[in-house]
């Protein structure tokens, strides 16, 4: 017991009458050599795996500790020397047998001669009141080796009393809590408070983000009032919010235990620690105890050009619907992030036009200074020969996972220049709005470029230089969602012309409920009830939708319900189905609507039996205890049976977080003249127009036009091929999480999760006067790949866990209208194609010399396709529009 007691002796020293205080942390006796054993081990698995299924490794050694100096004025100030000896590297808990990467390998072969020599060099710790004041080592030692030493040194830092304080150790400047008990002291480190410089980023939207949990507990065991051993465990776990099967866990353990003591060297005399260290060895230098960045070197990896050539075929247009295209896209982004501007630019200039759009997607998505410089050097916005590339660049900017001020500043500079295409100019401003919102979400609202962009958007709406620019600035505000823009939106919504008024109300529709105040709802009520001027149906119905979505009052709901029956025919039916959908789907406003419906004047048969074909419906695509995916479809027709607006939305919810996955709106107006019909009130003088607008992953894109004006309509009808118009097509980096983690053992961990998709959203509108039928189609096709890569690296041995999930899916919406009679026949169909789901997992252990162990697993399933249900009236109507075909076979009544 005496031998154990002298380790980290926690006692009132009796060897010197000059001691003025007592130890508050670990203390050693003089002229003793402490022989300890030390081990650090790490395990990686998929989050719920068993220990034997994990990968990892164990580094063990002997440790010699001696007290070199103690301050004559107090025993709480001491200098100790720590020397690592007898290093061994092996598997951590797993029995690999012949498959072990360490079998037959000596420690010098595994660790490396230079690394091992550096690891064995003694380090010095200056302890003051139990905390490491300075960490001394030799200059120019390998970073990975220094970090292993720091991991051991941090265990010597403790206090004997309970309390919360801040400590600096290998993890950084962290908040720690001590819990002192009779037989142990427990130190809990709050890893989320640690301040340490490490690269990393994540996606702002929580639906696409990563939930992580980190814990660190160090236990100092005490026997008979003396510390005898130190046991530490750190856990890092993560899961992708959107797909929780993409998960991982790192467990890092340390153990330091006394074995024996023997006679040691005399203490070095001196009053100042600096002089003592110089006397011991002048080559010692004070270095930070905080872990330093270990740069991973890729040996034998292909160059950027070689990598591009190996994946190029997967990114050809005809292959983009395959998951392999997205996998190649994600891997190439990782390579681009470590590449120089010149390398990137060289590939851009050498590529052919068929694959260039996909290359532009990847380069822009890399989001590094080098990739931004390269793409801006490559694109010429004054040339009309690269319009497609310019638009792909802008869309990739809009979807940027972690944009910075430099990207926004670059687009602001471009906007001030000249353009070969006005469409591109509009897209630049719209995407500026998207970047403003993302930067503000990341606490960047006061950045110089953001302030400039906000001023540009709001100024453009207050005093537009050109009337046609109003739409552009409204679309930018629809992305930026600036609270200070709401008064301008109300002005345009109430006093603007039809299309501008409608756009302004749709912008208000995207704001959070906290911004839709009573004043805002007063204006929207005036618009809906037409108190000051006549508005188009699209404007009025959108105003009503905003009111009903944002905590409507009793009178708000009552007045809207009382209006049903007094509206134009199709608007009556539309508003009725909106109310029914709120009740059916139990939306927040449903409670207030049920209260109002208790009044007989509101709830009567005449009001709720209005006929028509307009409709609204919301349903679930997927639903689980922690997440839900919903679709909603609302269609508004004119009184003559021609489509006025169709609106298809998909939302993803995780907890309270929300992602507007997609919205495709097809609008048409001024087409009544084609069938000699009478326009509805307020829509007598509308120009013929049809177009499509899309929101994708919370980003409003530039709308596209099918036709504009009667002459354009007739030429399109005469030359129509029925081919769909593409709204957005390309490769998108959707999930992007990267984290460098300094484990307290000294090992370096990396966590990279990426999700990408190849997407093609197209729409078409067919119109036949001969058959008196119109048909609209919206087609969504996607290939999705999510990858995660976790590694733990010591510089000479690495363990890793790679996982991948992939699928190809499709969703098609078709609306068929036969207007040869009234009420006209409408059939809506939403078809979800079958989707294969493939999951892969690879675990590995690898030496820096190249020898490795690999374990692979895969799982496949097929999610069946289906037709998503809409309301019962629609099903009955579809049976009329597309009557069941009689069974084939001889009827017996034919001529032959």
UniProtKB/Swiss-Prot annotation:
InterPro entries registered for this protein in UniProt: Lipid_transp_b-sht_shell, Lipovitellin_superhlx_dom, MTP_lip-bd, MTTP, Vitellinogen_b-sht_N, Vitellogenin_N
Keyword terms: Disulfide bond, Endoplasmic reticulum, Golgi apparatus, Lipid transport, Lipid-binding, Signal, Transport
Gene Ontology terms for molecular function: apolipoprotein binding; ceramide 1-phosphate transfer activity; cholesterol transfer activity; lipid binding; lipid transporter activity; phosphatidylcholine transfer activity; phosphatidylethanolamine transfer activity; phospholipid transfer activity
Positions of disulphide bridges: 174-194
Protein name (database record): Microsomal triglyceride transfer protein large subunit
Superkingdom to which the source organism belongs: Eukaryota
Catalytic activity field: a 1,2-diacyl-sn-glycero-3-phosphocholine(in) = a 1,2-diacyl-sn-glycero-3-phosphocholine(out); a 1,2-diacyl-sn-glycero-3-phosphoethanolamine(in) = a 1,2-diacyl-sn-glycero-3-phosphoethanolamine(out); a cholesterol ester(in) = a cholesterol ester(out); a triacyl-sn-glycerol(in) = a triacyl-sn-glycerol(out)
Principal localisation: endoplasmic reticulum
Localization (cell): Endoplasmic reticulum; Golgi apparatus
One Pfam family matching this protein: MTP_lip_bd
Function: Catalyzes the transport of triglyceride, cholesteryl ester, and phospholipid between phospholipid surfaces. Required for the assembly and secretion of plasma lipoproteins that contain apolipoprotein B. May be involved in regulating cholesteryl ester biosynthesis in cells that produce lipoproteins.
Quaternary context: Heterodimer; heterodimerizes with the protein disulfide isomerase (P4HB/PDI). Interacts with APOB. Interacts with PRAP1.
Family matches, as PANTHER family: MICROSOMAL TRIGLYCERIDE TRANSFER PROTEIN LARGE SUBUNIT, MICROSOMAL TRIGLYCERIDE TRANSFER PROTEIN, LARGE SUBUNIT
Residues of the Vitellogenin domain: 28-659
Gene Ontology terms: cellular component: basolateral plasma membrane; brush border membrane; cytosol; endoplasmic reticulum; Golgi apparatus; microvillus membrane; receptor complex; vesicle
Signal peptide: 1-21
GO biological process: cholesterol homeostasis; circadian rhythm; establishment of localization in cell; lipid metabolic process; lipid transport; lipoprotein metabolic process; lipoprotein transport; low-density lipoprotein particle remodeling
